[in-house]
Every structure is written in C-alpha cells, then in structure tokens.
C-alpha cells in the first residue's frame, strides 16, 4: 500500500497539458475533507488522468475520453501529501461505453462505466453518490470539484481538491458560445455567465453534484477555462441512468440514448 501511495503521489504531481479536453476547478476553494467522498482519481504510469465518481461499491462513472491503457483508480484521497488511512486502490475489471458512440468525436456520449476488480469499502472518506432521480432545472446551484488547475494560464495545481458552486444554464448559452461544434441534447450547460468559476484542465470525468445527486460528468468547455459566457459542458447523467442500471444488472447489450 505504501508503494502504491508513493506512486500515486508522484503521478498526481506529474500534471501537464497532455489532454486538451481535460478540465479543472478554477475559482473555487479547498474542499472540506468529507465533501468529496465519492470523488475518484484515475491514473496510470504516465501520470494523472481524470476524476471519476463512485456510484456503488463496485462501479465508477467517468468520461469516455478519459479511457487509457492500464489505469488504476484511487479512492479516499484528500491531500496529495498526507495519507488517509482508509485510502483504497482498485483496477478496472470491465469498461463499458455507449455502443452508438461516434468514434471520431472524443466527447460524443462522453460516459464510461467501470466495474471494479473488487468492491470498495465505505469509510470515513469513501462513499458512493446517488444517481439522479430527475434532471436538474435551469438555475439550480451545483457543485464541481477536482485537483485541476486553479489558475487557467499557469501550471498551478492544489494539494487538496477544490470545490466551487456554479449554475445550470440554458442550453442556448452553450450553443451560442460553441457555435463551431454540436452541443448534444444529452449534455448540461453549467457555469457562471460572468466567468471566474469553472472546471479546468485535469478535472475531466469528475462530478457535477446538484441536490447531493450525481447529475453531470465534466466533459469539455472553453479554453482557457472560466471565461465569461463560455460555460462548461457536462454529460447529463440522468439521460444515461437506464443504460447505467441495465449494464449493472448484467445487460451488456444495453444501448444509450441517441
């Protein structure tokens, strides 16, 4: 466990610009130690990959564009410098993607469901997050979190994950901001219209939490992050709940919404 922890610390510290689609929390504050019990770290031998969300003891949800070879998942992490005694590491046993996902668009149907090689034990710093019972309404206040950049134009990453509150915005805001590409109906548009708070580099795959339910997956957004009228685009978890539940129940041929 000590060797795994040392490796994980080194990997988390090796953050870089390698993934142009990854996002981070800019304009936030340090999360409280028990505020992110469902937050997962994905990493491999090349470094930190993405965030993820624990939805039960055997399954994690993250962004499809976070997929990589030979990654591991780390649970219960708060500080990169101080070990939590209940931290746990797992390998993916199986990975599931939408079968109708466009192969030439890395953020199309940007969701990956991961079955763990063994169950994670709930603890002081580890607990699953509930799937949504209904979609969030425009204006809802939601929370983002992650170890991504705290200054969009500099390689500055926090020791502990940062959290920030943002709002669900009308889809038209994102369609106007990103008129050069399609903003899918199965996404959420979320942020602050005047800018200053946003997910940013290396927050990809992490959760958007509204009313203590798992509503969104960090997918993509403006560059640099946190600019006025350039909010983040999040996979709408509610639209994929039937697919998630079908896969967990053993129906590996389940399809995603169009």
Swiss-Prot record:
Glycans are attached at residues 44, 121, 185. Expressed by the venom gland. GO terms for cellular component: extracellular region; secretory granule. Residues 25-249 form the Peptidase S1 domain. Its EC number is 3.4.21.-. Keywords: Disulfide bond, Fibrinolytic toxin, Glycoprotein, Hemostasis impairing toxin, Hydrolase, Plasminogen activation, Protease, Secreted, Serine protease, Signal, Toxin, Zymogen. SMART domains: Tryp_SPc. Residues 19-24 form a propeptide. Pfam families: Trypsin. GO terms for biological process: proteolysis. It is found in: Secreted. The keyword Transit peptide does not apply. It is an enzyme of class 3 (hydrolase). InterPro entries: Peptidase_S1_PA (IPR009003), Peptidase_S1_PA_chymotrypsin (IPR043504), Peptidase_S1A (IPR001314), Trypsin_dom (IPR001254), TRYPSIN_HIS (IPR018114). GO terms for molecular function: serine-type endopeptidase activity; toxin activity. Disulfide bonds join 31-163, 50-66, 98-256, 142-210, 174-189, 200-225. Monomer. Snake venom serine protease that activates plasminogen. This is Venom plasminogen activator GPV-PA.
């Amino acid at each position: 466990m000590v060797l795994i922890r040392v490796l994980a610390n080194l990997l988390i510290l090796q953050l870089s610009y390698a993934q142009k689609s990854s996002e981070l929390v800019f304009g936030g504050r340090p999360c409280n130690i028990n505020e992110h019990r469902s937050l997962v770290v994905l990493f491999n031998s090349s470094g930190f990959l993405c965030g993820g969300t624990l939805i039960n003891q055997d399954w994690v949800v993250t962004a499809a564009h976070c997929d990589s070879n030979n990654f591991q998942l780390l649970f219960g992490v708060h500080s990169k410098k101080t070990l939590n005694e209940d931290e746990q590491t797992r390998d993916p046993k199986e990975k599931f993607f939408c079968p109708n996902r466009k192969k030439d668009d890395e953020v199309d149907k940007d969701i990956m469901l991961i079955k763990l090689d063994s169950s994670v034990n709930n603890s002081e710093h580890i607990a699953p997050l509930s799937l949504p019972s209904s979609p969030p309404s425009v204006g809802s206040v939601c929370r983002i979190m992650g170890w991504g950049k705290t200054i969009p134009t500099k390689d500055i990453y926090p020791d502990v994950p940062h959290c920030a509150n943002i709002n669900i915005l009308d889809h038209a805001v994102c369609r106007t901001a990103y008129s050069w590409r399609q903003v899918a109906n199965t996404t959420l548009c979320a942020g602050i219209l005047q800018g200053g708070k946003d997910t940013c580099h290396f927050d990809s795959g992490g959760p958007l939490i509204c009313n203590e339910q798992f509503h969104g997956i960090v997918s993509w957004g403006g560059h640099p992050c946190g600019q006025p009228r350039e909010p983040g685009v999040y996979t709408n978890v509610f639209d994929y709940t039937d697919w998630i539940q079908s896969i967990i129940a053993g129906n590996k041929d389940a399809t995603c919404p169009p």
